[in-house]
Amino acid sequence: MPQKNSRKEYGADGYYHIYNRGVEKRTIFMDEMDYKTFIGYMKLYLSPPNMQGNKLKDPSGRTIPPSQSPNNYVDEIELIAYCLMPNHFHIFIRQISDRGMASFMQSLTQRYVMYFNKKYMRVGGLFQSRYKTVRVMDERQFTYITKYIHRNPLEILPKGPGPVGYFAISDLK
């Protein structure tokens, strides 16, 4: 019997709030480079192929050859907003094709886990479970989710200097 919520169906031209957190609520972004790497992978997956060039690098800084370049989802996913917190992330997207989100999220999270595990010399899963999604059905919900994603870091602002997370209305274009 399949796990609850293990089979997900998403429609084309739908808006979705996607989120996930670290297993045991662990930190999934340990330093600024981790945030930048996750954002870099999103940018690479969502940029037109002619803009990607040969920019993808592994954790040691070596360029990944074109034969190993990632899939591209620029015609399947439109990024609306995102927020990366120390132990979780939120991504708000418009899915253009029927299967874009599932492939995009699988590619993004697998590549980030590979980077993270190599960098921190660990093995195993990084995320608590498969990502969760909420379909945004109307303008009120759209506004609420956008505000929620951008206010999320304000809830845990530190008393001193230092990053609490990264968030933006799609600045990856």
Where are these regions (language model features)?
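Short catalytic/metal-binding and nucleic-acid-binding patches
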Residues: 1-172
